[in-house]
């Protein structure tokens, strides 16, 4: 499990407060804290959840003191000291300004305090033990606790998704090469994908074997983790559909996922009404960071605002809390993938929103959202944002030029990659449909294609950081960038390109690294660099192949060949750590290595973990060394009819070589005759004296 950090992982809180009217507080008797953005008192007593974000430099002591003060007027919910955020439920109308004053008076600075939603907290989320000092407060708590939501709210974002009928055709898998990728023979390490959604059906035959119930959780009651299976079981169908696209098993049933051997974890992030509130989102990302989740998928926008305004007092705290949690997850090893959204909006330039707030029917108003943030899609420093693609009618998904789905949001600076999102065939809950499969459309369906590819990359590169994984995801998407239609309407949606499952398992593979080639006269001591060396007598040649810990990747097999001698081979485990192969070739007599070539070639071949011939994981390295013939026993000058030669007792005469004799260098041509005068050797002119000694 990842270790928690006390360091706050977000900065710039003071900048967010510019231009905001803050509640005026009386002067304290000691050094005051600095107030942040604070929501106004509510019109009446009603149960509400609040996000409280202290400043980045708040101490552990300040955090605990702030929690204590908040508990005086409410019930403290989830606490995240690792990024200085906590949530509180209170019935008191003046909770936010009252807590703000209390913190400032105590010398505690904060970034923001404000509600997490528009709708009053009701039903199972109401904490009746909270402080109640008036009849108005008591009545508000009782009324809220007695009100229960059944089914989706009228304006829930999940109402956009209705399963379509049709023949099974998971065209998206073909388009990104996932079917071919599944057949590549390569070792895949364990990887876990967290599905932040409406839950997962644990009984689905295509999902249950890949589902890790021990790490699954529900965050939809005040953002407090609950691992009871009833808390994370899908109560819609959206989450089950997303899960199937990512990791439906390869089991001769239904459909395959992009990464069919990945483990999935349900992280239920929506409530029964279909709302994804900030406290749920913070819970989900913190859970991923603390439970060894490698990749997350977020196919939603954070309710109740399509765009959250950083300087709006009713929205700043919820936005800040979620942003901190998402950044915390990334900084703790999690690759976060998110859907761009389905409003045909320019995410580079948000202007008008008519959908928010969406958790109370009829409450939405038209508002200016310039500078607003769609969470999590527009948090590009912490997530990979995915646009949706459509397959033109009658085309082959393996080769077709794909188009932007008409509903997909877009933006040159906000879209990271593109993936199939229109009419995507995947799993549905067993209680929803028989057989439990169907089509859905949306960027919600595109994002899991990208999450599946990210999972494949992590299976191949288990030691990659999120930044490395994302960089490779984008690089490989660029290999098929030309399969995306140029947006003639100016709505740039392509990002780095089309996510590429096949490239994830064939290209940019981890490679073994070949260590220094050395030689020794006794095979045990005094190993010296071999490249371009001049050696004589009896020599050993050695090389060591190191695994990733030294530079890069693992080795499964290696060979070392000296000249035309029989190669020496060895095998490795393919593990990324603790795996090296040492090869020692020899002993060889130097005279026995002499040939017509001017040098001896040494070749090392190292094979990686991928057995597919198309993969780029194997390494071949060659160097040369020279045999210094001047030190060979029996060498002597011989004057032949063709000229002077230098021959040995075994009858061999130096040819096509430079030889140093008694301190002077001579060159002997292919006929073993000593060169004199000007001679062209390998395209270069050299000058030798009449005695044969090299002049330059």
Region roles according to the model:
Residues 1-31:
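Secretory targeting and sorting signals
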Residues 39-41, 76-77, 293-300, 382, ...:
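C-terminal subdomain of the subtilisin-like protease fold in secreted/lumenal serine endopeptidases
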Residues 627-696:
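Extracellular adhesion/carbohydrate-binding repeat motifs centered on closely spaced tryptophans
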Residues 269-378, 431-448:
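Substrate-binding/access-modulating region of protease and related hydrolase catalytic domains
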Residues 32-40, 64-167:
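Autoinhibitory propeptides
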Residues 197, 334, 362-459, 463, ...:
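Extracellular S/T/G-rich loop segment that most often corresponds to the catalytic His/Ser-adjacent loop
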Residues 146-261, 283-286, 290-317, 346-350, ...:
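Active-site core segment of subtilase-fold serine proteases
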Residues 243-246, 265-271, 294-295, 419-498:
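Hydrolase catalytic cores
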């Amino acid at each position: 499990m990842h270790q928690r950090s006390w360091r706050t992982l977000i900065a710039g809180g003071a900048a967010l407060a510019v231009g905001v009217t803050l509640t005026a507080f009386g002067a304290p008797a000691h050094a005051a804290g600095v107030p942040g953005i604070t929501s106004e008192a509510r019109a009446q007593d009603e149960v509400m959840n609040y996000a409280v974000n202290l400043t980045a430099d708040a101490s552990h002591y300040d955090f605990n003191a702030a929690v204590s003060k908040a508990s005086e007027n409410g019930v403290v919910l989830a606490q995240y000291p690792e990024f200085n955020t906590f949530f509180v439920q209170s019935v008191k109308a003046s909770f936010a300004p009252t807590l703000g004053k209390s913190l400032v008076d105590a010398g505690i600075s904060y970034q923001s305090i404000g509600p997490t939603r528009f709708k009053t907290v009701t039903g199972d989320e109401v904490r009746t033990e909270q402080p109640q000092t008036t009849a108005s407060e008591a009545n508000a708590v009782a009324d809220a606790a007695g009100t229960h939501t059944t089914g989706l709210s009228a304006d829930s974002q999940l109402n956009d998704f209705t399963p379509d009928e049709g023949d099974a055709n998971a065209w998206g898998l073909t388009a990104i090469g996932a079917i071919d990728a599944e057949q590549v023979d390569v070792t895949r390490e364990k990887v876990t994908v967290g599905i932040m959604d409406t839950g997962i059906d644990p009984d689905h035959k295509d999902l249950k074997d890949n589902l890790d119930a021990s790490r699954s959780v529900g965050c939809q009651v005040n953002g407090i983790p609950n691992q009871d299976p009833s808390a994370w079981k899908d109560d819609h169908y959206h989450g089950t559909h997303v899960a199937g696209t990512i990791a439906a098993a390869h089991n001769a049933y239904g459909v395959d996922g992009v990464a069919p051997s990945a483990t999935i974890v349900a992280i239920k992030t929506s409530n029964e009404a279909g709302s994804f509130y900030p406290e749920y989102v913070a819970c989900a990302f913190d859970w991923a960071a603390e439970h060894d989740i490698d990749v997350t998928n977020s196919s939603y926008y954070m309710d109740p605002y399509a765009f959250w305004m950083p300087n709006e007092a009713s929205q700043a705290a919820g936005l800040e809390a979620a942003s901190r949690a998402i950044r915390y997850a990334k900084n703790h090893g999690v690759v976060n993938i998110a859907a761009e959204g389905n409003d045909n909006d320019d995410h580079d330039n948000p202007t008008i929103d008519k959908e928010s707030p969406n958790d109370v029917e009829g409450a939405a108003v038209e508002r200016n959202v310039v500078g607003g943030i769609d969470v999590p899609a527009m948090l590009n420093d912490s997530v990979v944002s995915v646009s949706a693609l459509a397959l033109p009618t009658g085309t082959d998904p393996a080769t077709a030029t794909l188009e932007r789905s008409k509903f997909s949001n877009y933006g040159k600076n906000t879209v990271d990659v593109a993936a199939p999102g229109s009419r995507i065939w995947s799993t549905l809950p067993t209680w929803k449909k028989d057989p439990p499969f169907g089509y859905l459309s949306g960027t919600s369906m595109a994002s899991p294609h990208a999450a599946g590819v990210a999972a494949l990359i992590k299976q191949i590169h288990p030691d990659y950081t999120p930044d490395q994984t994302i960089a490779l995801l984008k690089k490989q998407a660029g290999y098929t960038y030309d399969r995306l239609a140029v947006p003639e309407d100016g709505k740039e949606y392509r990002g780095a390109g089309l996510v590429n499952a096949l490239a994830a398992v064939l290209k940019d593979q981890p490679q073994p690294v070949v260590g220094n080639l050395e030689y020794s006269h006794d095979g045990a001591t005094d190993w010296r660099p071999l490249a371009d060396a001049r050696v004589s007598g009896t020599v050993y040649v050695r090389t060591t192949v190191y695994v990733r810990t030294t530079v890069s990747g693992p080795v499964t097999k290696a060979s070392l060949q000296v000249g035309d001698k029989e190669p020496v081979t060895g095998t490795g485990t393919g593990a990324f750590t603790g795996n090296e192969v040492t090869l020692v070739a020899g002993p060889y007599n130097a005279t026995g290595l002499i040939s017509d070539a001017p040098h001896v070639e040494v070749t090392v071949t190292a094979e990686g973990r991928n057995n597919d011939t198309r993969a780029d994981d194997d390494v071949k390295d060659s160097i040369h060394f020279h045999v210094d013939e001047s030190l060979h026993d029996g060498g002597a000058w011989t004057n032949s009819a063709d000229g002077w030669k230098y021959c040995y007792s075994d009858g061999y005469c130096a040819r096509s070589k430079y030889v140093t004799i008694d301190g002077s260098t001579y060159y002997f041509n292919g006929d073993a005759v000593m060169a004199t005068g000007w001679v062209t050797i390998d395209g270069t002119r050299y000058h030798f004296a009449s005695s044969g000694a090299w002049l330059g």
